[in-house]
Amino acid sequence: MRLVILDNYDLASEWAAKYICNRIIKFKPGQDRYFSLGLPTGSTPLGCYKKLIEYHKSGNLSFKYVKTFNMDEYVGLPRNHPESYHSYMWNNFFKHIDIDPNNAHILDGNAADLQAECDAFEEKIKEAGGIDLFVGGIGPDGHIAFNEPGSSLVSRTRLKTLAMDTILANAKYFDGDLSKVPTMALTVGVGTVMDAREVMILITGAHKAFALYKAMEEGVNHMWTVSAFQQHPRTIFVCDEDATLELRVKTVKYFKGLMHVHNKLVDPLYSMKEGN
């Protein structure tokens, strides 16, 4: 497991975006070889998406041969609702890049048969050859996607009832009105993400510090679902200084001492431009 510690949110976002960019370019995607990328929503990845859009607009990165799979979607919220994750992804990322809409996979929370929708999503991932890099974020309680505390660590894509802490946290997106906040969602399972060849989790802010401590310094525990990634062969946690506040000093010092190695993963930044 790698822990990459940057000074602040902006630098953490940039590091993550550079890593995604380099992974896609090194993969050399093409018409018969698509790169499969798992993606999160929420406030944490916005900075990363902004940088990826910059790399695309500068001609350094193309998503023409990339397939994306989003982590989750609310149940019962229309796709065109401003707070649906479909709207989030198109407004904040997809409409600014050259991805084929048919290759941007987002769960349908209004499907007539929700279980069939979940099963079909898992099948699409298999048909794509699995996910090369799954990018995620976590909540203050350590949940990844909508795998709330107590979720099975081998779970697959399914329908989940949201924890009250999650509903309260999401109320800010619905004018503070709890009655408007969806109480159920479709989500990839912990096992779905664990199947990815590589996982990168973005963790920023002091309010995520205890979750990072649980993920890094304590054992695997289904009450802290992010801890499952201790058992993944290729996990990277990308965080800012604030997120490390609950870690032991020697833990932080150890991983900061490896930054010269970690930075080689993003420097130089590769480009798809001719001659680069």
UniProtKB/Swiss-Prot annotation:
The modification Phosphothreonine is found at residue 161. GO terms for molecular function: glucosamine-6-phosphate deaminase activity; isomerase activity. Keywords: Carbohydrate metabolism, Coiled coil, Cytoplasm, Hydrolase, Isomerase, Phosphoprotein. It comes from the Eukaryota. It catalyses: alpha-D-glucosamine 6-phosphate + H2O = beta-D-fructose 6-phosphate + NH4(+). It is found in: Cytoplasm. GO terms for cellular component: cytoplasm. Its EC number is 3.5.99.6. Residues 103-131 form a coiled coil. Pfam families: Glucosamine_iso. PROSITE patterns: GLC_GALNAC_ISOMERASE (PS01161). The active site is at 72 (proton acceptor), 141 (for ring-opening step), 143 (proton acceptor), 148 (for ring-opening step). Allosterically activated by N-acetylglucosamine-6-phosphate (GlcNAc6P). Its main location: cytoplasm. Disulfide bonds: none annotated. Belongs to the glucosamine/galactosamine-6-phosphate isomerase family. Homohexamer. Catalyzes the reversible conversion of alpha-D-glucosamine 6-phosphate (GlcN-6P) into beta-D-fructose 6-phosphate (Fru-6P) and ammonium ion, a regulatory reaction step in de novo uridine diphosphate-N-acetyl-alpha-D-glucosamine (UDP-GlcNAc) biosynthesis via hexosamine pathway. Deamination is coupled to aldo-keto isomerization mediating the metabolic flux from UDP-GlcNAc toward Fru-6P. At high ammonium level can drive amination and isomerization of Fru-6P toward hexosamines and UDP-GlcNAc synthesis. HAMAP family: GlcN6P_deamin. This is Glucosamine-6-phosphate deaminase 2. It comes from Mus musculus.
